[in-house]
Amino acid sequence: MSIALQTAGIHHLALRVTDLARAHVFYGRTLDFPIVLETRDSFLALAGHTVLVIRRVQPETTAGDRFDASRVGLDHAALACGSETELERTAAALDAAKVPSTSLRFDPVLKRRYVAFTDPDGIAWEFYMAPELELAVADD
């Protein structure tokens, strides 16, 4: 039996980080995502229409633990990019800010360009060409 889940997309993405202050600088200043709520152990940032919930690691987290895309679970998160100009500007800005990233790449399966980068905990992100999604958001 099919559940036939109907959704407009991801509401929020929750990430655990080892250093909340460092993550606040990365997401709030480096990526310039608006911080909309802060608590002692977390903050919420807006990535377009998606809420990022950034939380401290749990006390039982193994010391030195880092994100690993090869484990079962999240491989990476991709943010939609609406124009080639913005993609190129972002790739250059990541490089200038010394954020670990790839150069602009081409996905041969979906035939789209993107740039991949990591946050200070090694959490993998992509900024991925999807102009049709940007147009849909602009029409909301």
Language-model region placement:
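N-terminal beta-strand motif that seeds the catalytic metal site of vicinal oxygen chelate
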Residues: M1-A21, L74-L79, P131-D140
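Short beta-strand/turn micro-motifs at beta-sheet edges
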Residues: M1-I3, T62-F67
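Vicinal oxygen chelate
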Residues: S2-Q6, G9-T18, D65-D140
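Core segments of cupin and vicinal oxygen chelate
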Residues: R16-Q58
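Alpha-helical elements of the RecA-like P-loop NTPase motor core of helicases
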Residues: H24-V25, E88, W125
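A short, polar/proline- and glycine-enriched secondary-structure boundary/capping micro-motif
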Residues: P34, R56, A63-R66, A136-D139
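Short, charged/polar, Gly/Pro-enriched secondary-structure boundary elements
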Residues: T50-I54, E60-T62, D121-W125
